[in-house]
Amino acid sequence: MSGALDVLQMKEEDVLKFLAAGTHLGGTNLDFQMEQYIYKRKSDGIYIINLKRTWEKLLLAARAIVAIENPADVSVISSRNTGQRAVLKFAAATGATPIAGRFTPGTFTNQIQAAFREPRLLVVTDPRADHQPLTEASYVNLPTIALCNTDSPLRYVDIAIPCNNKGAHSVGLMWWMLAREVLRMRGTISREHPWEVMPDLYFYRDPEEIEKEEQAAAEKAVTKEEFQGEWTAPAPEFTAAQPEVADWSEGVQVPSVPIQQFPTEDWSARPFTEDWSAAPTAQATEWVGTTSELS
């Protein structure tokens, strides 16, 4: 399919991207029309997709998209969440018309409604989830391209690109690859230099995961500021200006502090006024008497 041209052959970095994203991993079920794209079957029942056939169909789909004179006449659709961001990014890069989310029935057939469109080419992410636009495309003789898994029905699909259309990374990578090949065939970007757009921008991210990451980053920033504040706070006793002393042997003149004066009385000069050997006081006698009476 690549015409035996070296520039159109699949590079090693492309294969590594496919393997890292899990594009070659299909499902446990197999449609009879997808048997031609299967390489092997694993011991756990998962079918392995032949990436060589995936690359050939990717180039064929890119040629079909480039053949449309007006890029806006190409409609790209994804009703599933995993492909909506990729569809929007693909449309922004190639000029296609995106439909991300629910497809309104009658968009291609009902001329009365405001959302009526007449595209010349349709690209969908999942033939099973996007069955409505595929069915309407068959009514108006609209050629279709679809990312197909091992169990995807190929009814009303003209160009099937075998790949894993369930994983978020695989779907994002396939749309990124398709956008890159379209731009290369149009001459917008060169094949000699890598595309500056990263595949990560086409990946779907769960809003809950993004919120959790933002909260974790905010908490980490707060704890880091508190930690730095505790250790970087200036201590007043160490940062106070110290007096300059030319000769350290002289020392620093310490300001004199008034010392509280206490009476210097001679305790031995006091007259002896009490005899410790005298008899106990009357009060003690009374207590003794009281004790004797009680006894």
Curated annotation (Swiss-Prot):
Name of the protein: Small ribosomal subunit protein uS2
Keywords: Acetylation, Cell membrane, Cytoplasm, Isopeptide bond, Membrane, Nucleus, Phosphoprotein, Receptor, Repeat, Ribonucleoprotein, Ribosomal protein, Ubl conjugation
Binding partners and assembly: Monomer (37LRP) and homodimer (67LR). Component of the small ribosomal subunit. Mature ribosomes consist of a small (40S) and a large (60S) subunit. The 40S subunit contains about 33 different proteins and 1 molecule of RNA (18S). The 60S subunit contains about 49 different proteins and 3 molecules of RNA (28S, 5.8S and 5S). Interacts with RPS21. Interacts with several laminins including at least LAMB1. Interacts with MDK. The mature dimeric form interacts with PPP1R16B (via its fourth ankyrin repeat). Interacts with PPP1CA only in the presence of PPP1R16B.
Ranges of compositional bias, category Polar residues: 280-295
Similarity section: Belongs to the universal ribosomal protein uS2 family.
Residues with N-acetylserine modification: 2
Cell location: Cell membrane; Cytoplasm; Nucleus
Region feature Disordered, mapped onto this chain: 214-240, 263-295
